[in-house]
Swiss-Prot record:
Originating species: Herpetosiphon aurantiacus (Herpetosiphon giganteus)
Protein name: Putative type II restriction enzyme HgiDII
Chain spans, region Disordered: 355-434
Ranges of Basic and acidic residues composition bias in the record: 355-364
Sequence repeats: 382-392, 393-403, 404-409
Reaction catalysed by this enzyme: Endonucleolytic cleavage of DNA to give specific double-stranded fragments with terminal 5'-phosphates
EC number: 3.1.21.4
Length: 611
């Protein structure tokens, strides 16, 4: 190479910044170390969490000193350049060669011990030494070695972390679910187990086996999932792979839970996998539609072609999501949207009417946990990419979508308008205590959230007023009040008079309220407004208002924005709706799910015969 007079250099400070940015979250550290154990052909990796240290040990092939220097301690080592498969034939999970950053990101001291071919060795990394090297502009760091007489490891690799920077907290309880949901290789006939504090992770640690009501599995190879869930009511097979997916294998399942509250915010509940490891937590993040069903969605989609050795890395640098513009992702996204979600949207409402929606009301014996006792009925559903329906008879007749109260918008997205259909059957009404409990649960959800206190207090006040409206004012007032809360949560900044201005902007609102003008002091208190609405609006008006709220939040305000632009009082409402379109609060989904649940209970208790 000719001497051009230029050179590219790196500082240890780069290492420091990368570790803090990519692996400051302790969960990412665990994910990386479990993946490393898999790549080392381990059959077992143990994690022991103590108050002042974390110990991770596997029984893999181990590292030699040369391996440690050229692979483990080398930033940017490309694992798959050596081989895409391990000695035992496993596909390698690691790719970028930045695993060492996982250690630097969460601990100040790391002891690493390994033994390969009967030769043990060990070294100790001190974050403080690296930081001192940064101040001295040092470009090379040499960990201190462990004397041979102090080595006791006989096989595999052992890492001990001390001076943990992240709070361990209730680590064991949440870590089981975290790992169980982010790897498909654990306890899945892959000869690989993860043990936390001497107790192996099992399928129950996924914490949703008894929560899935309906299941759609992808191809015959995924039919095992029909026997996986303990309270499953019905399962369907989606056999069509979709246009443009030739040569690509997609496996897994999508299900719907009994209640939105069965899906906790802090855990991933619909995930993309490749080669047994999570590559993106949210399947629906780039799929927008107005269907209520999506609040109930849970699932796992396995697409190994998304992490092909022969193509560019599709995962972002933080290893948490897929690059949105990659053609492979766009094809998969289209398949999920057309051939999976439309199928679910067109059948879910009918299934919910046909089967009970509360598993707690059913008596389930311990024997029901066995695979053979599962009462699910299997049906094959051939998903058609040019049809938005898939009923029990696998009909592609477009009228089926209308019967199931799902309609297709101009842009091809499916709207689920069934939530407020007048033909809702009248099941045994839930006790009023159940509705009261739902309000109480929602209040607790808000109280325990991390939203600003001022906003939290306003939302809590509105929940209480909605409860009062239900008890003594008007069912219709309660519904509109809940819609106002729903809107307010998504706005992020709530002004009580904004709800009046918002209602004025909707063309469905009767003229008497429109004539009041914006921000009328008489209606500054939502209780008064709710009382007025309860005596002025028809039941259909209330349904349309709350339906627009639900539709608008799910579609990030796109439809509402258009409505507001054409309204007689756009003003600050347009500004607020733009805020809604940008709003991305991680807790909002949970609030909305609970609101849907409460509204559903209220509607069941007060059937649509109210004038």
């Amino acid at each position: 190479m000719s001497d051009s007079g230029y050179e590219l250099s790196f500082s240890l400070n780069t290492l420091n910044h990368l570790s803090e940015g990519l692996y400051s979250n302790i969960l990412r550290f665990y994910l990386k170390l479990v993946a490393n154990a898999w790549d080392a052909d381990a059959t077992e990796v143990s994690i022991n969490i103590r108050q002042d240290e974390i110990v991770i040990q596997d029984n893999g092939i181990g590292m030699s000193i040369e391996d440690a220097n050229t692979k483990f301690l080398r930033i940017g080592h490309q694992k798959r350049e050596d081989s895409a498969n391990t000695i035992s034939g496993r596909h390698v999970m690691g790719r970028k060669g930045i695993g060492i950053l996982a250690i630097f990101g969460i601990a100040n001291i790391a002891e690493v011990y390994s033994c390969k071919d009967g030769v043990p060795h060990g070294f100790i990394i001190h974050k403080g030494d690296i930081e001192r090297g940064i101040s001295s502009d040092v470009t090379l760091y040499r960990p201190s070695s462990v004397p041979q007489e102090a080595l006791s490891i006989e096989s595999g690799t052992k890492i001990i972390l001390r001076e943990i920077k992240s709070s361990i907290g209730n680590a064991e309880k949440t870590l089981r679910t975290d790992l169980a949901r982010r790897f498909t290789i654990i306890n899945n006939n892959c000869n690989f187990s993860v043990i936390i504090n001497n107790t192996p992770i099992n399928d129950n640690d996924r914490d949703y086996l008894n929560k899935v009501q309906f299941l759609w599995y992808l191809g015959g190879e995924s039919s095992k999932y029909a026997n996986f869930f303990t309270k499953l009511k019905k399962s369907f097979e989606i056999t069509n792979l979709g246009d443009g997916m030739s040569g690509m294998t997609v496996k897994g399942w999508i299900g719907t839970v009994y209640r939105p509250s069965d899906i906790p915010n802090e855990q991933p509940y619909h995930i993309y996998f490749a080669h047994g490891k999570m590559i993106q937590e949210d399947i629906l993040i780039d799929i927008t539609d107005a269907g209520l069903y999506r609040q109930y969605i849970i699932g796992e989609i396995e697409a190994d072609f998304m992490d092909s050795d022969d193509e560019d890395d599709i995962i972002t640098s933080n290893r948490q999501r897929i690059k949105q513009t990659d053609p492979r992702y766009l094809k998969l996204l289209e398949y999920v949207k057309i051939d999976i979600m439309r199928v679910i949207a067109s059948t879910w409402t009918k299934l919910r009417k046909e089967y009970p929606s509360n598993p707690k009301k059913e008596e389930v014996n311990d024997s029901s946990l066995s695979k053979d006792s599962n009462s699910s009925e299997k049906e094959n559903t051939n998903a058609s990419s040019d049809s938005s329906t898939a009923t029990e008879n696998a009909s592609s007749d477009s009228s089926t979508a209308t019967e199931n109260a799902s309609s297709e918008t101009n842009d091809g997205e499916v709207e689920d308008n069934s939530f407020f259909d007048d033909d809702i059957p009248e099941p045994s009404p839930p006790p009023k205590q159940e509705i009261t409990t739902a309000f109480r649960e929602m209040k607790n959800l808000v109280k325990n959230s991390n939203i600003p206190n001022q906003m939290k207090n306003i939302i809590l006040y509105d929940i209480q007023q909605a409860a009062y409206a239900y008890k003594g004012t008007s069912f219709k007032a309660c519904i509109v009040m809940l819609g106002a809360i729903l809107e307010g949560v998504m706005l992020g900044t709530i002004q009580r008079t904004d709800v009046l201005e918002y209602l004025i902007a909707l063309p469905q609102v009767p003229k008497p309220l429109s004539d009041l003008g914006p921000r009328n002091p008489k209606f500054a208190d939502r209780t008064v407004l709710a009382q007025y609405i309860g005596t002025t609006f028809s039941f259909q008006d209330c349904k349309e208002i709350i339906e627009l709220c639900v539709q608008g939040t799910n579609k990030l305000g796109v439809d509402i924005l258009q409505t507001v632009r054409n309204s007689i009082h756009p003003g600050s409402v347009l500004k607020d709706m733009k805020q809604l379109a940008r709003f991305n609060h991680q807790s909002a989904v949970g609030y909305i799910a609970k609101l849907h649940e409460i509204i559903n209970l209220v509607i069941l208790w007060n059937p649509p015969s109210i004038p």
